A protein has these predicted regions:
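Acidic/histidine-rich helix-loop elements
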Residues: 42, 46-68, 84-97, 248-251, ...
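Short, histidine-centered active-site or binding-site loop motifs used for metal coordination
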Residues: 52, 86-88, 121-123, 154-156, ...
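Hydrophobic alpha-helical segments, especially transmembrane helices
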Residues: 3-4, 17, 50, 82, ...
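Bacterial Sec-dependent N-terminal signal peptides
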Residues: 1-23
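Extracellular glycoside hydrolase catalytic/binding regions
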Residues: 28-31, 55, 60, 78, ...
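Aromatic-lined substrate-binding rim segments of carbohydrate-active enzymes
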Residues: 64-137, 176-178, 258-269
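Generic cytosolic/nucleocytoplasmic N-terminal low-complexity/intrinsically disordered segments
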Residues: 1-2, 42, 101, 308
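N-terminal carbohydrate-binding accessory modules
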Residues: 21-79
Length: 320
């Protein structure tokens, strides 16, 4: 009996030492938006923090359940993002079956692991017909799972806000036909930087919408935070679905001071943030070296400086 009691105490101690990501869906459940804030099932503010995979067609080797499990267990991610490449070689337009298979592998694993997951239409141009078909199929499959978040348009580049808005409303209607509740992320022009313009003419009469803001800290500094502050003051809810510490090219030196300013700003405003990317390209923003295992279990020597810093930030901020 004494041994049984000792084992029970040890088990309880181990459970209390688990990272918060272990219980994230159980804790937060169905998310919703109220004003500028993302709230959980208990109407409490929630900040999701995690990693974006790289384009599925360029770095497919990481799109597997083991990598998702490792990002949750070791990096303490509460959300992961699956960017489905659309236009480049090997993308959705070339091979839709493989594209969907890769995205579903990540989504299914995130559901299994009890964390949130973003289905990202990773495109720079409006492709209404293809996007409508894709999001209809995803909403049919996953509309009952509170884990799932839909990202309609990764980074509109030269499209105007009226064009992006019209496209987004069409896709929102498509998703809402099958999924009335889950969070939808709406892009804005100029690589998700013109959130202040979107705030002046937001999408009305739909619930649970957030607008994406992307930053790369060595390029995007206080001027972009000023635009974001303007958007928030106008009532626009934001979500940082892609970010990192180097230049907007994805390369160049990391500006750690400016990166930390962004993280502190996001935390102060209770805005979720995701870092780019789980990939091994020869550039600063890819957090892994080619030596990294395809299924997680990465050693410190497998991580670039951006990976070491991101892992540290995620483990620190997702600790509680």
């Amino acid at each position: 009996m004494k041994k049984t009691g000792t084992y029970l105490l040890l088990l309880i101690a181990c459970i209390h030492q688990l990272p918060s990501s272990a219980q994230v869906i159980k804790k937060h459940g169905q998310l919703h938006v109220d004003g500028t804030q993302l709230l959980d099932q208990h109407n409490q503010p929630v900040v999701l923090r995690g990693m974006s995979f790289g384009w599925h067609n360029f770095w497919p080797r990481f799109y597997n359940p083991q990598t998702v499990a490792w990002l949750k267990k070791d990096w303490h991610c509460t959300v992961v993002r699956a960017p489905m490449g659309i236009e480049p070689k090997g993308g959705y337009l070339d091979d839709s079956a493989t594209a969907v298979q890769k995205v579903r592998a990540v989504v299914d694993a995130a559901i299994q692991e009890g964390i949130y997951v973003i289905i990202d239409w990773h495109c720079h141009n409006i492709r209404l017909k293809e996007a409508t078909s894709f999001f209809a199929s995803m909403a049919k499959l996953y509309g009952t799972y509170p884990n799932v978040i839909y990202e309609l348009f990764n980074e509109p580049d030269h499209e105007s806000w009226p064009e992006v808005k019209a496209y987004s409303k069409e896709i929102i209607d498509t998703i809402r036909a099958y999924d009335p509740d889950n969070i939808i992320l709406v892009g804005s022009p100029h690589w998700d930087q013109d959130i202040d313009i979107a705030a002046g003419d937001p999408i009305l009469n739909y619930k649970n919408l957030l607008y994406t803001l992307h930053f790369y800290a060595a390029t995007h500094k206080q001027y972009l935070r000023d635009k974001a502050n303007t958007a928030i003051q106008k009532g626009l809810p934001l979500f940082i679905s892609e970010s990192a510490g180097m230049e907007a090219s994805g390369d160049g030196p990391i500006n750690e001071e400016e990166w930390l300013r962004w993280i502190l700003w996001a935390e102060q405003n209770k805005i979720s943030w995701i870092t780019w990317s789980v990939s091994d390209k020869n550039e600063t923003c890819s957090v892994l070296y080619p030596t990294a295992n395809s299924t997680g279990r990465w050693r410190k020597r497998d991580l670039k400086s951006s990976g070491i810093k991101t892992r540290m930030l995620l483990r620190e901020y997702n600790r509680n």
